[in-house]
Regions:
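Catalytic alpha/beta core domains of metabolic enzymes, predominantly
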Residues: 5-148
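A glycine-rich helix N-cap at a beta->alpha junction
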Residues: 1-2
């Protein structure tokens, strides 16, 4: 996956992806219409739709994630309703959760557990909203996600 292609710099990312056989992460700022528009622009530059992965950007849980969730859900529902411009897999990288104020200001011995909890719940919610790929940083988050997703 090569990324991120954004509205102001998608051509160079698309060219590199095409030249080297990579998929493109199309990142738009938490907006269904902007995600759709970027996918169209990428396809017009020659990137096949099966080589595009949508990243609608994910805020941390409690920091706008509710809106991110809503946008991800609407993208997935539009795709399921037949909108080919949004029928691509989604990626979510809620890694901001490790540095939010609640984690930074927690008692030192609780910071690690709190960081894992915030990252886990945000990542799990992203899966529920329709993300196919979720990027996390903490190894304990990976363990917990594997456990609940394999259940």
């Amino acid at each position: 996956l090569l990324g991120t292609a954004e509205a102001d710099r998608y051509r160079s990312v698309a060219a590199a992806a095409l030249a080297y056989g990579h998929l493109v992460i199309a990142q738009s700022p938490i907006d269904v219409n902007l995600a759709k528009q970027l996918n169209i622009l990428l396809r017009e530059t020659g990137v096949p739709e099966d080589r595009i992965v949508i990243d609608p950007y994910t805020g941390a849980l409690g920091y706008g994630f509710e809106y991110s969730y809503s946008v991800m859900e609407r993208i997935r529902l539009a795709a399921l309703a037949g909108d080919g411009d949004l029928a691509m897999p989604m990626i979510s990288a809620p890694t901001d959760t490790l540095t939010i104020r609640e984690v930074r200001e927690a008692v030192p011995e609780e910071q690690d557990a709190m960081a894992v909890a915030w990252e886990f719940y945000t990542a799990y919610s992203a899966f529920a909203a329709g993300a196919s790929i979720v990027c996390v940083r903490h190894p304990l988050t990976v363990e917990r996600l594997k456990k609940v997703l394999e259940a």
